[in-house]
Amino acid sequence: MVLETISKIIKTQLPAYLKKFPLPETIGGFARLTVLDWLRLLPLLGILTLLGYLTIRPFLPKKKKQKDSLINLKIQKENPKVVNEIDIEDLKSTNVCYCRCWRSKTFPVCDKSHIKHNELTGDNVGPLILKKKII
């Protein structure tokens, strides 16, 4: 089914398209093309542009991976790591650590990804620790 469709396009529709194709013989002939002629040229120009891009793409400069940026810009910068502990009476478990660096694979729970982030960037972000308040 697919091969029959491709065969029909190549054997029937493509030759019919190329017969009606308004390709001028000189460069100055492009200036004399009508709007309808330009519209007929658009699919071919699009395909040629795509093929040209795909050809030169391996030679284009690669984008550099952006360096991890700081998260904590001004809070307690004098401390090596900012960790806040909050006592809550109604907490079901004894301790819960929440991520504030947005790098945790178990987000929102902290998996200590901030340690690697802090080493790479020089940041001082740490987790938010919720403790069960002992009455």
Curated annotation (Swiss-Prot):
GO molecular function: 2 iron, 2 sulfur cluster binding; metal ion binding; protein homodimerization activity
Membrane topology note: Single-pass membrane protein
Cofactor binding note from Swiss-Prot or TrEMBL: Binds 1 [2Fe-2S] cluster.
A Pfam family of this chain: zf-CDGSH
Coiled coil: none
GO biological process: autophagy of mitochondrion; regulation of autophagy
Cytoplasmic-side positions: 61-135
Swiss-Prot/TrEMBL cofactor(s): [2Fe-2S] cluster
Lumenal compartment residues: 1-37
InterPro entries per record: CISD1/2, FeS-contain_CDGSH-typ, FeS-contain_mitoNEET_N, MitoNEET_CISD
Binding sites annotated in the UniProt record for [2Fe-2S] cluster: C99, C101, C110, H114
A cellular component annotation (GO) from this entry: endoplasmic reticulum membrane
Signal peptide (residue range): none
Keyword annotations: 2Fe-2S, Autophagy, Endoplasmic reticulum, Iron, Iron-sulfur, Membrane, Metal-binding, Mitochondrion, Mitochondrion outer membrane, Transmembrane, Transmembrane helix
PANTHER family: CDGSH IRON-SULFUR DOMAIN-CONTAINING PROTEIN 1 (PTHR13680), CDGSH IRON-SULFUR DOMAIN-CONTAINING PROTEIN 2 (PTHR13680:SF33)
Protein name: CDGSH iron-sulfur domain-containing protein 2B
Source organism of the structure: Oncorhynchus mykiss
